[in-house]
Design a protein with these regions (language model features):
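Hydrophobic alpha-helical segments
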Residues: 1-85, 90-99, 116, 120-191
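Short, basic/aromatic beta-hairpin or loop at an interaction surface
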Residues: 107-116
């Protein structure tokens, strides 16, 4: 009787673990970033390239004012990049489920409500100035459950109606930055 109980318990344990063992692991192969604004340099540095369900990839987004004049940047939730997500199309419809990028700033902001099922946002914009030579940076994480498979993912605003904007004078213009993240599945030993 004890042997049967042991065999049953062992089989259930192995079956339970098989889902975890079979989860795909990914690697960030490449990131590209640019902005269409001459006086702003936008770059993304991959800090942790491997991504699984338990361990996220980590990126540092950097925005630098390379011009001679101050630039005001306006966004929602957190400054300067706002709430962002990844989609497999740069022109994604954000009403379709996206892979959210998480940030410690989301947790500490009183303008962002993070829930297991998504995020909420206080619609009050945040405007700050980036002086010449000054940099703003933010660390983001991409968890394995947010990845839908291999391919190139594009960073987009989490909400369509919260596009960032910038001003060098009195007129605000949509802030267009572009970032692509190429993700590859890692080779795994057969189970």
């Amino acid at each position: 009787m004890k042997r049967r109980t042991f065999v049953t318990a062992s089989a259930l344990s192995i079956a339970g673990l098989s889902g975890c063992i079979a989860d795909t692991e990914y690697r960030i192969a490449e990131t590209t970033a640019r902005t269409g604004i001459d006086s702003l340099d936008f770059s993304v540095r991959t800090e942790v390239p491997d991504v699984t369900i338990e361990h996220p990839a980590e990126f540092v987004f950097i925005l630098e004012n390379t011009g001679n004049d101050a630039v005001r940047i306006k966004n929602h939730g957190v400054w300067p990049f706002g709430l962002i997500a990844v989609h497999q199309s740069p022109d994604a419809d954000t009403s379709i489920a996206s892979g959210k990028l998480s940030s410690q700033s989301y947790e500490t902001s009183d303008r962002v409500d993070v829930k297991p099922t998504g995020m909420g946002l206080d619609r009050t914009p945040i405007a700050q100035t980036l002086e010449p030579g000054e940099r703003a940076r933010e660390t983001y994480r991409l968890h394995g459950e947010e990845i839908r498979g291999e391919g190139t993912y594009h960073v987009v605003p989490y909400f369509d109606d919260t596009l960032p904007s910038y001003a060098m004078g009195d007129e605000w213009t949509t802030f267009e930055y572009q970032c692509a993240i190429r993700i590859e599945a890692k080779e795994r030993l057969p189970v």
